[in-house]
């Protein structure tokens, strides 16, 4: 996984560590039998001021999983939270401020009952929210979801089952992780076919050289 912010020296060490961690998670979930046959690039479009902190690492992972699975993510939910290589969501700073900022944006556009924020479970007890937000949550006009794992987050964002690894190494049929696994297997097959074709081409050239 290429962190474009890091390559352009616009990423702090904490953000770079978060990207490396999500790459480790992907490897642990989908590269137990074969290496990951995929190259991905992450960037914050039209960002010119630099990026630091790992609180976006869970959102970055969800975006990668969405792309690999060809499954769209809900755009009415904001996400914050860092991850570890086990797929556990870890606490972040400024949770209250992040919720309030997204709430203000949603309120300005009009609350429709579908908007909300996904935060780490460990941050729940530290929230100091405005009465206005509490009232909106109680009225089901705005939602705050706490998650402990990547699996919980991806299910909220897609409305689909994340999937569990079966004894045969495959993920649950039709799940998000199963779709990711299928895409990666397709990439592997394409690479293997290209390697075979390249090897055959080299053998043919060698045979022609010997005949000459």
Language-model features and meaning:
Residues 1-10, 14-212:
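Peripheral, non-AAA+ core regions of ATP-driven protein-machinery
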């Amino acid at each position: 996984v290429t962190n474009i912010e890091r390559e352009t020296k616009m990423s702090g060490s904490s953000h770079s560590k978060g990207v490396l961690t999500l790459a480790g998670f992907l490897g642990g979930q989908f590269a137990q039998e074969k290496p990951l046959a995929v190259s991905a690039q992450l960037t914050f479009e039209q960002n010119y001021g630099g990026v630091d902190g790992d609180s976006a690492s869970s959102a970055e992972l969800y975006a990668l999983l969405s792309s690999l699975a060809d499954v769209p993510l809900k755009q009415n939910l904001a996400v914050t939270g860092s991850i570890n290589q086990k797929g556990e969501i870890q606490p972040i700073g400024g949770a209250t401020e992040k919720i309030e900022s997204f709430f203000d944006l949603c309120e300005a556009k009009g609350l429709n009952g579908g908007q909300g924020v996904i935060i780490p479970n460990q941050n729940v007890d530290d929230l100091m929210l405005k009465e206005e937000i509490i009232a909106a949550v109680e009225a089901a006009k705005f939602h705050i979801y706490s998650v402990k794992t990547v699996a919980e987050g991806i299910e909220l964002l897609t409305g689909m089952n994340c999937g569990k690894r079966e004894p045969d190494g495959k993920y649950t049929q039709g799940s998000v992780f199963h779709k990711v696994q299928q895409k990666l297997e397709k990439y592997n097959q394409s690479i293997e076919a290209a390697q075979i074709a390249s090897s055959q081409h080299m053998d043919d050239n060698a045979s022609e050289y010997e005949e000459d």
